[in-house]
Structure formats: structure tokens, C-alpha cells
Amino acid sequence: MKRGDAPRTVSCGVVILDAAGRVFLAHATDTTHWDIPKGQGEPGEAPADAALRELLEETGIALAPARLLDLGRFAYRHDKDLHLFAVQVAEGEIDPGQCTCTSLFPSRRDGSMIPEMDAYRWTVPADIDAYASRSLARLFRTKLSLVDLHRRLTGA
């Protein structure tokens, strides 16, 4: 099977922006990069439901489905697409210091169960390259401008 013939997986995620246009990122444990809360859906699970479930599992943040703006599906890596949703939150609505991850995976070092995400932050769009994975930074740079998304969410 050629590389392009392999089935593409789809992760569903939520791009959270605050009133200032900063994006909410979560640090992927045992890596150097930060990410948006996202993950694969369960069989039969709608993309919005998968995105909200992953958000809750990876951050402890619960949002109402009606708040989500469906941004659609984006090519992310050679083997994966992202189905993304966006939401704007009010100032102070999400405190990164209060977030917690309940989704665990085995550590590459010793096999002990550790949280998928271990830290949280608000980041201005100009600093995305310093924090996000190359794939996510490229997506925000080429296909989904955070500045334009902020304008869209605020109606500006």
C-alpha cells in the first residue's frame, strides 16, 4: 500500500479563543510541544461530541454544544485530518491553572500511566510557532488564521 492509500484518521478538536484573540493550548506530556485539545472519536460519535469529550477529558473544561462553530475538516498530516470547532470564551472563563487532564496513557519511559496533557496556557497567535507542533503551527499559518478566526467569532 502506498503512503497516500492508507486510510486517514480524523481527530476532532476545539480551538478556544479568548476576548483578546489568544488561543488556549495544552502541553502534551513527555513532548516539547503544545496542542489544542483534540482526539479521535468513538464509533458512531458525532464530531462535535468527540471534540467536546476530548476537551473535557484533556482539560476538565465543559462547554455547551450550541457554543461551537463548526470549522470543518482540515488536512493535518499525511495520515491525519482534523475536524475542528471554535469557541470564544469570556475573559476569565477559563483559568489554565484550574485545568486538569483525566485521560491517561502509558509513559514511554517506564510504562506508568500519565496524563495526556500536563500544563495549560493562553498564547498570542504570533507565538504559536514557539509552542505548537510543526503540523499545528502550519495549519494556523496556512489554512486557519487565528487572527481571522477571532474576527469571525467576534463579528468584527
Residue ranges and their predicted role:
Residues M1-G4, L71, P106-G111:
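Short, P/G- and charge-enriched loop/turn segments at secondary-structure junctions
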Residues M1-V23, P43:
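Conserved N-terminal beta-strand and adjoining loop/helix that marks the start
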Residues T9-G13, K80-L84, M117:
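Short hydrophobic/aromatic beta-strand or adjacent loop that forms the aromatic wall/cage
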Residues A26, L71-R73:
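Residue-level detector of high-confidence beta-strand sites
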Residues G41, I128-D129:
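A generic structural signal for short hydrophobic patches within well-formed alpha-helices
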Residues A62-L71, D95:
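A short coil-to-beta-strand element that immediately follows conserved catalytic motifs
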Residues F74-R109, R121-A126, L139-L149:
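Active-site-adjacent beta-strand/loop module that shapes the phosphate/pyrophosphate-binding cleft
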